[in-house]
Regions:
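Phosphate/pyrophosphate-binding betaalpha-module
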Residues: 134, 138-159
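Short, positively charged patches
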Residues: 1-139
């Protein structure tokens, strides 16, 4: 789990969305090497401003990163990063793929998948319905994918 800390830490920096994340990985190959890069090398990446380079050089491991790591440990999720061979190749073809996926079970390109995305401020009804729906979909051998955000996304994996 500790080797994913740099992945989570980079994702937690304000201003680093999926597009910039991919550009950084394309340039430096891993978050660890991103953090080791000089400010000068960082600003060579399209979209990285001097201010953002400073933020990258001084990351703050906040509560959200600690909560994500705790969730991975408790639920025993496997984290598949965009540099892993298991990462779905089609996802890498979009401009802003998620840098990593939370996986329960195994990834298989021939399995039917459904993505669940929703509000972080979901109602009880929304969370309950999402859990029931996803529970039923799994019975039909569907793979549930989400960003694992609080709310509907995480409820999808609780069903």
């Amino acid at each position: 789990v500790d080797n994913i800390l740099p992945w989570f830490a980079l994702k937690s920096i304000p201003g680093i969305g999926d597009l910039l994340y991919k550009r950084l990985i394309d340039r430096f190959n891993s978050p660890k090497l991103v953090f080791e890069a000089t400010r000068e090398n960082l600003v060579e990446v399209e979209g990285i401003t001097p201010r953002l380079a400073v933020a990258i050089k001084k990351p703050k491991i906040g509560d959200s990163v600690k909560k994500d790591l705790d969730l991975v440990r408790r639920k025993r999720y496997k984290i598949v990063t965009m540099t892993d061979t298991e990462y779905p190749p089609l996802l890498l073809q979009i401009p802003d793929p998620p840098p990593f996926l939370y996986v329960l079970g195994r990834l298989n390109g021939s399995i039917k998948n459904i993505a669940v995305v929703g509000s972080r401020n979901a109602t009880r009804y929304g969370i309950s319905t999402t859990r029931r729906l996803c529970h039923d979909l799994v019975k039909f051998k569907m793979t549930i994918a989400s960003g694992m955000a609080v709310g509907i996304d995480s409820a999808a994996h609780e069903g």
